[in-house]
């Protein structure tokens, strides 16, 4: 029996890595979104006791945290569409590329969700005491959101090439 490199690259377990990439993109981004939502909501709840008129204005961090989960959903669906069976030509390098794409999107989303949660909590509480802090909070939230967006862009490049 001879060793054939083309057959070795089409290992039967190669699609497992592709599916793990899709799963990790969804799981980690949703964990980040959940943390960001929960942490920001705690700040909104405590701020709402003192200044209930600012509650609707302070919902922005919660919305931005929810968008992080959508990034993971988009990447997971793109990766899911690219994974085929090993007999159809799905190789290990494609599987590892899809795993890297999923981890990139997922971990960037996790970090972005943490950042949005911390900034949202502190920013909402600070805005209740000093309304001029609102613009600064929004700017920092945008920079935090962009971390997740960068992860999605890199994941889409990795997953489709």
Swiss-Prot record:
Q: Where in the cell is it found?
A: Membrane
Where does this protein chiefly localize?
A: membrane
By its UniProt entry, which Pfam families does this protein fall under?
ATP-synt_C (PF00137)
UniProt GO cellular component terms: proton-transporting V-type ATPase, V0 domain
The GO terms this record gives for MF are: proton-transporting ATPase activity, rotational mechanism
Q: Topological domain, Lumenal: which ranges?
A: 1-15, 80-98, 159-161
Essential for proton translocation, annotated site positions: 145
Can you state the subunit structure given in the record?
Answer: V-ATPase is a heteromultimeric enzyme made up of two complexes: the ATP-hydrolytic V1 complex and the proton translocation V0 complex. The V1 complex consists of three catalytic AB heterodimers that form a heterohexamer, three peripheral stalks each consisting of EG heterodimers, one central rotor including subunits D and F, and the regulatory subunits C and H. The proton translocation complex V0 consists of the proton transport subunit a, a ring of proteolipid subunits c9c'', rotary subunit d, subunits e and f, and the accessory subunits vah-19/Ac45 and vah-20/PRR.
Physiological role: Proton-conducting pore forming subunit of the V0 complex of vacuolar(H+)-ATPase (V-ATPase), a multisubunit enzyme composed of a peripheral complex (V1) that hydrolyzes ATP and a membrane integral complex (V0) that translocates protons. V-ATPase is responsible for acidifying and maintaining the pH of intracellular compartments and in some cell types, is targeted to the plasma membrane, where it is responsible for acidifying the extracellular environment.
The cross-references to PANTHER family, in alphabetical order and at most eight, read: V-TYPE PROTON ATPASE PROTEOLIPID SUBUNIT
Record protein name field: V-type proton ATPase 16 kDa proteolipid subunit c
User: What organism is listed for this UniProt entry?
Assistant: Ascaris suum (Pig roundworm)
């Amino acid at each position: 029996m001879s060793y054939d490199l083309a057959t070795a690259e089409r290992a039967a377990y190669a699609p497992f890595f592709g599916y793990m990439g899709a799963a990790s993109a969804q799981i980690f981004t949703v964990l980040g979104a959940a943390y960001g939502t929960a942490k920001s909501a705690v700040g909104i709840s405590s701020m709402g006791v003192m200044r209930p008129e600012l509650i609707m204005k302070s919902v922005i961090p919660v919305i931005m945290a929810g968008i992080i989960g959508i990034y993971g959903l988009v990447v997971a669906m793109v990766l899911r569409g690219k994974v085929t069976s090993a007999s159809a030509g799905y190789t290990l390098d494609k599987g590892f590329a899809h795993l890297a794409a999923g981890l990139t999107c997922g971990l960037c989303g996790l970090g972005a969700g943490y950042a949005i949660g911390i900034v949202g909590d502190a920013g909402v509480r600070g805005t209740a005491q000093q309304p001029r802090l609102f613009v600064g909070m929004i700017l920092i939230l945008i920079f935090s959101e962009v971390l997740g967006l960068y992860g999605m862009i890199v994941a889409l490049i990795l997953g489709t090439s």
